Amino acid sequence: MNDLLPDLCDHYEQDVRWLPLVLNDYGGKKIFYGEVVTLRCFEDNSLVRDIVSQDGTGKVLFIDGHASYNGALLGDQLALLAVKNGWQGIVINGTARDVGTLATLDLGVKALGTCPYKTVKRQTGDMNVTMTVAHTMIYPGDYLYADLNGILLSKQSLDLSVL
């Protein structure tokens, strides 16, 4: 299957929310889904390391970086750590770096763009909070479905076997 979202929209139209945000695909995994873990941070990715160091089996990290282009919230080292710990994907309302390497990893990565600079490390940010991105509410525990068509969110896990 190359396109998941159109089929989900056709079958679960009343159960999904579209995230109207144009993101670039940088990871090696083009279709990914899982339970959402949220992080709100601004130009500081130290909490990203804390989160991807934990078991991420069946989970997707959604980072609201306030659309800043001043420092990458994800690079190759954190992405490798995420893969090692079973994360399905990382979505960034902000930037990533080392995208040549990210493209080789078994991890979904979507971001606004790239920035070659690293962020500062102040241990600031808010984990597992409700966020608003592109006029869309994103809740910890939501389920996120992503492919090259974009991102859908749902309050519950969707049965993909019906597609």
Curated annotation (Swiss-Prot):
Top-level class of the enzyme under EC nomenclature: lyase
MF annotations from Gene Ontology: 4-hydroxy-4-methyl-2-oxoglutarate aldolase activity; metal ion binding; oxaloacetate decarboxylase activity; ribonuclease inhibitor activity
Required cofactor(s): a divalent metal cation
E.C. number: 4.1.3.17, 4.1.1.112
Entry annotated with the keyword Lyase: yes
Domain of life, source organism: Bacteria
GO BP, sorted A to Z: regulation of RNA metabolic process
Pfam families assigned to the protein according to its UniProt record, in alphabetical order: RraA-like (PF03737)
Cofactor note: Divalent metal cation.
Catalytic activity from the UniProt record: 4-hydroxy-4-methyl-2-oxoglutarate = 2 pyruvate; oxaloacetate + H(+) = pyruvate + CO2
Residues involved in a divalent metal cation binding: D98
Keywords noted in UniProt: Lyase, Metal-binding
UniProt entry tagged with the keyword Metal-binding: yes
Binding locations of substrate: G75, D76, Q77, L78, R97
Similarity annotation: Belongs to the class II aldolase/RraA-like family.
Quaternary assembly: Homotrimer.
Task of the protein: Catalyzes the aldol cleavage of 4-hydroxy-4-methyl-2-oxoglutarate (HMG) into 2 molecules of pyruvate. Also contains a secondary oxaloacetate (OAA) decarboxylase activity due to the common pyruvate enolate transition state formed following C-C bond cleavage in the retro-aldol and decarboxylation reactions.
Name under which the protein is recorded: Putative 4-hydroxy-4-methyl-2-oxoglutarate aldolase
